């Protein structure tokens, strides 16, 4: 251990009276290592450390000096959360597909393991992550603390909301110092009976052994019986494409109205491609441009310059993307349609 200050962030389930602490030094000599707080001193000899007997918390921190042969070498500041669950992500390949890899691009997808532990230390979920990727628009571009999307290998209720789903989001709340806004308004929306409102809860995130802060874990706005209850096109694609979404590559094309769309190559189209589709209006502007652009695997630009992400199905074939981009263009044309006097009519005979 070197340097003046070190911070240890513990989950709510950790026992401060039975903490296992290890101090590593760069010396081969026999050294006496001690922890000293405002209430006492304890030699580190392999026994558990009772933090509460060594120091009182001040401003939420237990401050312990590390003494090496009686000389102060560093200070450890210990903080502990209260009343929220802890979520542990462990990458399958932390060397090449760890957090740095995932944070570098929303196109980078990793796999791993997930452990969710409640405030009392009970495992809520312990299983595989079949997908782990960064998400967000402006927050992804500008914030160091990234948000993520995770996909479990089976449906599970991570936050005791009564709904089991595979796909969840971890919202960083980078632009909200209170970390309350998103949850507060979603809870309000649920109380008002608004449809398609995702359930949320706070968690502490530990990613490959590093504490990343408090996140909001949320159901993803997705197509399912407890979410947006429309025809699930992803299931239709999965039924006719083995390994759907694996090693997917994309290409660009134009629909019959001359608007660009992006699709996934090599897919067999389902027999019925009329829906449902879950769309997202994307307002993020691309570099060196004043115009937004879709930033998912499937997306299109409308005649009015709006950028639309297709959130479900995540990977769309060429015919499906042509269909939904043209359908939306006809909707947009109707919205902006005017008669000879400039009155909006809601009808466009040309489309």
Annotate each PLM feature.
Residues 1-62, 66-80:
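Predominantly extracytoplasmic/ectodomain segments of secreted and cell-surface proteins
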Residues 36, 69, 153, 208-209:
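Short strand-turn-strand beta-turns centered on an Asx-Gly dipeptide
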Residues 159-214, 314-350:
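A conserved hydrophobic secondary-structure block that centers on an alpha-helix together
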Residues 218:
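Gly/Thr-rich phosphate-binding loop signature of adenosyl cofactor/nucleotide-binding cores
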Residues 223-351:
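ATP-dependent phospho-/nucleotidyl transfer catalytic cores
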């Amino acid at each position: 251990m070197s340097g003046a200050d070190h911070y240890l962030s513990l989950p709510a389930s950790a026992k401060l009276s039975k903490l296992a602490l290890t101090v590593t030094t760069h010396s081969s000599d026999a050294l006496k290592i001690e922890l000293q707080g405002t209430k006492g001193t304890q030699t580190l000899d392999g026994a558990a450390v009772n933090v509460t007997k060594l120091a009182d918390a001040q401003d939420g921190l237990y401050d312990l000096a590390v003494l090496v042969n009686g000389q102060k070498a560093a200070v450890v500041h210990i903080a502990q959360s209260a009343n929220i669950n802890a979520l542990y992500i462990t990458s399958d390949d932390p060397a090449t597909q760890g957090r740095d890899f995932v944070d570098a691009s929303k196109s980078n997808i990793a796999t791993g393991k997930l452990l969710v532990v409640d405030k009392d230390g009970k495992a809520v979920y312990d299983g595989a992550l079949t997908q782990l990727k960064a998400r967000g628009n402006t927050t992804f571009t500008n914030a160091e603390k990234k948000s993520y999307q995770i996909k479990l290998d089976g449906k599970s209720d991570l936050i005791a909301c009564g709904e089991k789903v595979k796909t969840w989001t971890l919202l960083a709340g980078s632009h909200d110092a209170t970390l309350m806004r998103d949850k507060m308004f979603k809870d309000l929306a649920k109380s008002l009976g608004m449809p398609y409102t995702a359930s949320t809860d706070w968690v502490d995130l530990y990613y490959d052994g590093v504490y990343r802060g408090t996140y909001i874990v949320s159901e993803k706005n997705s197509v399912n019986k407890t979410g947006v209850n429309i025809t699930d096109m992803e299931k239709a694609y999965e039924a006719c494409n083995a390994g759907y979404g694996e090693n997917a590559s994309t290409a660009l094309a134009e629909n019959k109205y001359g608007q660009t769309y992006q699709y996934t190559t090599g897919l067999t189209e389902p027999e019925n491609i009329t829906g449902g589709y879950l769309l997202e209006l994307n307002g993020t502007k691309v570099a060196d441009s004043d115009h937004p652009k879709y930033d998912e695997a499937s997306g299109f630009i409308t005649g009015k310059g709006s950028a639309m992400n297709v959130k479900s199905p995540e990977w769309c074939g060429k015919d499906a993307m042509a269909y939904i981009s043209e359908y939306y263009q006809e909707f947009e044309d109707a919205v902006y349609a005017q008669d000879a006097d400039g009155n909006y009519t809601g009808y466009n005979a040309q489309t």
